[in-house]
Amino acid sequence: MEQEQAEIFALKALAFLAQNEDKMNIFANLSGLGTGDILQRAGEPELLAGVVDFFLSDEELLADFCNANDIHPDTPARMRQALPGGDLPHWT
């Protein structure tokens, strides 16, 4: 996946996350940013990588997002590979 596609995907995920105040607050706490800061920095690839990581760490949130947007459950992990830090080698 190209980075631009992955960034668009992550922006959709962030918009979905912003609709859930509890989950958004958890993400804000984990990131060390306020919700306003997160939204201001939404175009930064590193932040978007963190958004996708957050979805990948929360199975219920991931399933809700995928179901609401008709996205195959494997897509977020593939998109993550195109964002900063996602191209790490697999040693197995």
Where are these regions (language model features)?
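Metal- and O2-centered redox machinery and metal/ROS homeostasis
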Residues: M1-T92
